Amino acid sequence: MTRYKAIISYDGSGFFGYQVQPNTRTVQAEIEKALEKMHKGKSVRITASGRTDTGVHAKGQVIHFDSELDITAEKFQKALQVMTPFDISFLTVEEAPADFHARFGTVGKEYRYVIKRTKIFDPFSRNFALHYPYELDIAKMKQASERLIGEHDFTSFCSARTERDSKVRTLYSIDFYEEDAETLVIAFQGNGFLYNMVRILTGTLLDAGQGRISPDDITKALLAHDRQKLISKTAPPQGLYLWRVDYE
């Protein structure tokens, strides 16, 4: 039995998230369906670094699976690329140590959120970015983001549906990239993220850029440990990308 590590990307627009769910199209289900065919009807379970929600994309999701097939990692990659749908891509497949774990072995992740600042709505980017035709003060967004860096209890910045007992996470950095006059990308790097955390942080920073909230409001929200104390909305899913997963 050999363990394999794969880095995959996918367009989340046509999926009801990553995780298998009854009677819905998910990333996990499509990959496991392909592996089952390769293993002549035998079920093969995959494990990912984490789940993504409906409409959320991935540029560098990491999965692992075990197989008894006597084929090279390169052939696995080629076969899975052919046997999975067009909205999933296998960037790499390699043999991994038997104790490698895509989920529990992570030491950090990077998410990016893409914002289109065009005055006129672009239908061709609607599934891949948030359309935000309002003025933004990037300097204010950067000032607000500084209050979020470091180790904090992020209860106020995650969904009430979060299943984790501890809401303490460390944000290493929040960077802002103006790729062009119309595109703003916010990159979040941390040791882990809670359910809807990046989307709530994005909504908060957009409010800061509009002058609706101040850096002090963010500090108060962090200390309140209560999502209801934060007025910012959760940014929609289509602008969010799981960009990279780090391991030791």
UniProtKB/Swiss-Prot annotation:
This is tRNA pseudouridine synthase A. HAMAP family: TruA. Its EC number is 5.4.99.12. Belongs to the tRNA pseudouridine synthase TruA family. InterPro entries: PsdUridine_synth_cat_dom_sf, PsdUridine_synth_TruA, PsdUridine_synth_TruA_a/b_dom, PsdUridine_synth_TruA_C, TruA/RsuA/RluB/E/F_N. It comes from Listeria innocua serovar 6a (strain ATCC BAA-680 / CLIP 11262). GO terms for molecular function: RNA binding; tRNA pseudouridine(38-40) synthase activity. It is an enzyme of class 5 (isomerase). NCBIfam families: hisT_truA. Substrate binds at Y111. Formation of pseudouridine at positions 38, 39 and 40 in the anticodon stem and loop of transfer RNAs. Keywords: Isomerase, tRNA processing. GO terms for biological process: tRNA pseudouridine synthesis. The active site is at D53. It catalyses: uridine(38/39/40) in tRNA = pseudouridine(38/39/40) in tRNA.
